Amino acid sequence: MAIEILSDGAVVRTITHVLTASLCDKLDGTLTFDFTALQKGEPPILPGMTAKYDGQYYSIVRVKRGFSAGLEISAVSCEHISYILNDEQYNLVTFVFEGYPAEGLQELLQNTPFTVGVVEPAAMVECAFTDESPLNRRAALMRFVEQ
């Protein structure tokens, strides 16, 4: 299990041994990652950095530093990078779409820091998310991929 710590897109540290790790992936879209690592002689892990684990990126939101058995440790709490879409600046009024999934994702991610990768489903889809306003973009994205 290796965790890469990135700052401004560059790897500043690779953690190959962790003391504890916990990944929470729920049906409601919750995706968090917490881990504890030795800090001795390593660059500090700070909120605002990014952790990469198992091909997924997580925003480091909290770091608690302390000592255990005389060793300096960092307890790190992370949220999946997609939580950025919860920021108010990305809210939508509504989202109505009819077309191919890749095009819908392109439209949903427009004006965000994200881009569409490989999209396997090719059948036409239609959706109308008009039941709440403002519409949280991450919630709309989760609803769209469930279509």
Placement of each model-derived feature along the sequence:
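Charged- and aromatic-enriched interaction segments used to assemble
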Residues: 73, 79-147
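Assembly/oligomerization scaffold segments
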Residues: 1-94, 142-147
